[in-house]
Amino acid sequence: TALNASYVARDELIASALAQEGMEYIRSVRDNNYLNNRSSWLTGLSTLGCYNNAASYCIVDPTLGDVNTTPSAISASALASVPVLKVTSTGLYNHRTIATNTNTRFKRTVQLTTVNGNEVKVMVVVSWISAHQSYSVTVTDNLQNWL
């Protein structure tokens, strides 16, 4: 129906924004490594369980701002257990368990794969279920070493 189509379109817009936010978060980690003269452009990323591991995914929560512990690895077999994003009353999406947050239907995962010594492929997937149907939006980008 037209109503269902409008809900799907709304969810696709939200998912696209969440996927892009995840990509921008990973990009900001790379940028901050450069700006802070860290020894590796992948500091905070290369030690994650989802780095060069096709059987593992990470979740990111840019609102926490902790690049070393925020992304946590989730095995492919446990992908169904990825926590849903929550939303605040002001529309901010996060993973915080706070009484005022409301669960959403959206889940966001990240994978990082080495292309070569100076390039990493980042894939962010936002998935959700609506009316018993699975949907997803995928954003990929290759990040370069600026160091």
Language-model regions, residue ranges each:
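Aliphatic-rich helix starts adjacent to a transmembrane/signal segment
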Residues: T1-Q20
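Low-complexity, Gly/Pro-rich coil/beta segments used as flexible assembly/activation regions
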Residues: A17, M23-L147
